[in-house]
A protein has these predicted regions:
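Conserved beta-strand/loop scaffold segments within soluble protein domains that form the structured core
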Residues: 26-200
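Short, Gly/Pro- and small/polar-rich lid/capping loops
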Residues: 1-29
């Protein structure tokens, strides 16, 4: 069993705030690696009953194309899903996620995006369930007029944790970014939201 450091801020702030990063317990030796997929379909259920599981998904939209993928993430243990999106010039990828861990379970939802030329990525994410959710989104707006938009809704219950980290790097000219997040915390649930827009 080791500590995995995730959701790190690009530039550290005061340690006493407790938001520089998050750590989760993870047993790499016990991790079940689920088959990697290059998403050609439009919907995908990613579910596991293993104590520790990991899955990687890649989506590529060629020049001028438009793709949409709906994912449901469920687990009874601990699940790490890495989804990598690449939008070429003039392409658009829409990723819709329902993140719903079971009772006392944990989902680490990692989204990596690359927007080339005027490529665009849209993330629509809803977080529900009875477990802990750690969400890491890292987007590179590499081309002129590249764009990213995120709309996030959440509900956390009991004493569970919702920890979100979004980092958008603006490398190209005339790039656009919009991030919206709203939701509710019930009982003793806690939330950390980090949003970084970095003009390179």
């Amino acid at each position: 069993m080791e500590k995995m450091t995730i959701n790190q801020l690009p530039s550290r702030t005061w340690n006493r705030l407790g938001v520089n990063e998050a750590t989760i317990d993870w047993d790499e030796s016990a991790t079940v690696v689920l088959p990697e997929e290059s998403a050609e379909k439009t919907d995908m259920l990613i579910a596991s009953d293993a104590a520790y599981a990991r899955k990687r998904v890649t989506v590529q939209a060629e020049k001028g194309a438009k793709k949409s993928l709906f994912q449901i993430l469920r687990t009874a243990g601990k699940l790490h899903v890495q989804t990598e999106l690449t939008a070429e010039d003039g392409a658009e990828i829409e990723l819709i996620q329902l993140v719903a861990p079971g009772e006392n379970a944990l989902v680490y939802d990692e989204v990596i995006g690359h927007c080339h030329g005027s490529g665009r990525i849209v993330l629509r994410q809803v977080t529900l369930g009875h477990g802990d959710v750690y969400a890491q989104t890292g987007i590179g707006l590499d081309g002129e007029n590249a764009a990213f938009a995120a709309n996030i809704g959440y509900l956390a219950r009991k004493n569970k944790t919702l920890d979100m980290n979004l980092v958008v790097n603006h490398w190209g000219k005339k790039t656009k970014c919009e991030i919206n997040a709203s939701g509710a915390l019930n009982d003793a649930a806690k939330k950390i939201f980090r949003g970084t827009i970095d003009f390179k």
